[in-house]
Amino acid sequence: MENVRNIVTEALGKIKERGGLKAVYFVACGGSQAAIYPGKYLLDVEAKNIPTKIYNSNEFVYATPASLDERCLVICCSLKATAETVEAVKKANEIGAVTIAMTGNPETGMAKVGQYVVTYSNGNDQIYSLGNQAQVLRICFEILHQVEDYPYYDEAMAAYAQIDEIIAGAKRDWLPRAQAFAKAYKDDTMFYILGAGPLWGTAYSMVNCHLIEMQQRNACLIHSGEYFHGPFETTGKGVAIVLLMSTGRTRFLDERVLRFLNKYADHATIIDAAELKLEERLGKHVAEFFNSVVMIPIERYYVSVMADERG
């Protein structure tokens, strides 16, 4: 935590000498982009004067935003050295922005090109409170604290001590649910995954990384708020649907979908962050920002149990 604080302090100090922070850009591909989305969500809803954008790495390279300059901070993420993301860091450096490379260890190709490097725990035995999602949130809470004197900074920092136990407890207590999901969905070939707000990146990860990439199962990513603008027309018997429900200010979107599914769907699973009592355990002002930190490991656990069921 101290390392992240020092990095943000130095990076912001450099930008302050150039006129002050203008914007924060988040750049990555695939699961890494899903992992850094919580940082963007946090700044979007809590920062008063810090605009953000998120880019696929190659799009950032080939359609570089004209607004990018030496007053911008670019946060890039890749476990090792995804070629497009390495090029994105180089592009940001070339333009004069300050870059933070998030990566799996200090010796990766990403670490070699970032002006600052933040490493994160990874792999099957990772410490989730030190994983990529947790670390990007540390960076962004620091930005909020140092630039706008964020009033809930201490509450956010205290929340990290609870994360690993919450995830371990959910895997233990929800094993019967995961097993029931596995038996009910193991033969499905198409999934509709819904989420919004702090769980939009979680839904992206479940679709693209855990179902399509790892299980070779077709899946469609649908924003809970967009569900009623076309996708709901396919809801019916036998359609495999997973709704990821968040806590916080966008929960209304998920609850509206839930009411519809309860009425018209017969093959839907709900994974609800509220059942984990996150506001009580993490703090009512910051819990929603940690939703994805907790829920990506849980949805992946569901898919993993289903993979075991399939053999």
Question: Predicted segments — roles?
Answer:
Residues 2-23, 141-223, 228, 236:
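Active-site phosphate/pyrophosphate-binding segments
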Residues 7-11, 59-66, 228-231:
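Structural motif
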Residues 20-153, 157-159, 244-271:
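Glycine-rich phosphate-binding loops that contact phosphosugars or nucleotide phosphates
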Residues 50-58, 70, 218-229, 238:
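Acidic, glycine-rich catalytic loops of TOPRIM or P-loop NTPase phosphate-binding modules used
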Residues 106-118, 230-234, 277-288:
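Glycine-rich, charge-decorated loop segments at or immediately adjacent to ligand/cofactor-binding or catalytic sites
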Residues 225-233, 252-256:
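A short, acidic, amphipathic alpha-helical segment used as a generic capping/interface helix at domain edges
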Residues 234-236, 240-242, 304:
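Long, low-complexity, Lys/Arg-enriched
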Residues 263, 273-310:
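Structured C-terminal subdomain patch of bacterial secreted/periplasmic proteins
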